[in-house]
């Protein structure tokens, strides 16, 4: 397969991308034309903040061509349809895309993730992996594995914040505790909690896809839990409330999350950078004293017990 590569200005990139798709290309991506140079302009900001730069000044539009397509004809058609300067058709190039088994390649990038000696996150294509304790005879008898494939919802166990919350659940979760996972994503924390001995478990997310993903993943892992949107969350307190989101939403949600923790219950927060820990803890100070439970790769897990 081949890719058509063309540099253009910021104002032209969207219209050209749409027109290329209408002209029959298989996919379009837009990259920084100055990537890897001193002029490169990263778009990302800090977690929970808006990026300072919203678009690149010079864009590189990359279109994946169908087999046998005439790149010059497709480009001219797209430029005309978008009402752009015909001179834009000069200076394009082609690059070969090596054939690959994309499914196998993707799967190779997601292996089993050990959270501890006995707790593992295991993609479905590693169900019979002898390297994972508890998946084959004669392996660790008390091993717990959570079957989870990468999907539309956040949470595969690879991010430090997910790892931190899983580690807390394994080390500190009271047996039979009623638990709320707020911002559940894939449902990984709620599912882990159930497998680690939690009682009634409720998973909440603002994204309907995440709620459905949690339902599906719970079924795969043969655990019972409730998954819902925030408006459907019934009244009541929980012995454990865990929220792995970002620092700004955590601060905004402080009254609600703290209010959901029963007296003597635990609040576990992550999605917080080390330098953000104090300001997040301060947001919860009227209700709980939060402190850093553990740090991993610049991220922290905050924990507090409600008086």
Curated annotation (Swiss-Prot):
EC number annotated for this UniProt entry: 2.1.1.-
Keyword line: Cytoplasm, Methyltransferase, S-adenosyl-L-methionine, Transferase
Superkingdom field: Bacteria
One Pfam family linked to the record: PrmA
Compartments in which it is found: Cytoplasm
GO molecular function: protein-lysine N-methyltransferase activity
Main subcellular location: cytoplasm
Similarity-based family: Belongs to the methyltransferase superfamily. PrmA family.
NCBIfam families cross-referenced by the UniProt entry: prmA
Protein role: Methylates ribosomal protein L11.
Protein name: Ribosomal protein L11 methyltransferase
Species annotation: Bordetella bronchiseptica (strain ATCC BAA-588 / NCTC 13252 / RB50) (Alcaligenes bronchisepticus)
Primary gene name: prmA
């Amino acid at each position: 397969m081949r890719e058509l590569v063309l540099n253009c200005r910021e104002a032209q990139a969207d219209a050209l991308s749409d027109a290329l798709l209408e002209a029959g290309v298989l996919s379009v991506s837009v990259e920084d034309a100055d990537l890897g140079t001193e002029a490169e302009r990263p778009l990302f900001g800090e977690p929970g903040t808006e990026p300072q730069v919203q678009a690149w000044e010079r864009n590189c539009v990359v279109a994946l061509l169908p087999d046998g397509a005439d790149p010059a004809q497709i480009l001219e058609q797209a430029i005309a349809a978008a009402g752009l300067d015909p001179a834009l058709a000069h200076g394009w190039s082609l690059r070969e895309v090596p054939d690959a088994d994309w499914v196998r390649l993707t799967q190779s990038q997601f292996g089993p993730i050990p959270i501890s000696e006995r707790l593992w996150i295991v993609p479905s294509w590693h169900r019979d992996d002898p390297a994972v304790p508890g998946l084959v005879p004669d392996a660790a008898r008390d091993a717990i594995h959570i079957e989870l494939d990468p999907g539309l919802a956040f949470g595969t166990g690879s991010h430090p914040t997910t790892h931190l919350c899983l580690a807390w659940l394994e080390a500190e979760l009271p047996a039979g505790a009623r638990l709320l996972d707020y911002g559940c994503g894939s449902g990984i924390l709620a599912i882990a909690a159930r497998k680690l001995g939690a009682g009634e478990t409720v998973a909440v997310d603002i994204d309907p896809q995440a709620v459905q993903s949690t339902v599906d993943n719970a079924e795969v892992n043969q655990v019972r839990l409730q998954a819902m949107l925030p408006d459907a969350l019934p009244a009541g307190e929980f012995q454990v409330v865990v929220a792995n989101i970002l620092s700004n939403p955590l601060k905004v949600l402080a009254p609600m999350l703290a209010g959901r923790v029963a007296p003597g219950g635990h609040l576990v927060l992550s999605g917080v950078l080390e330098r953000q820990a104090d300001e997040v803890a301060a947001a919860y100070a009227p209700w709980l004293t939060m402190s850093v439970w553990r740090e991993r790769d610049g991220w922290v897990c905050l924990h507090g017990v409600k008086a």
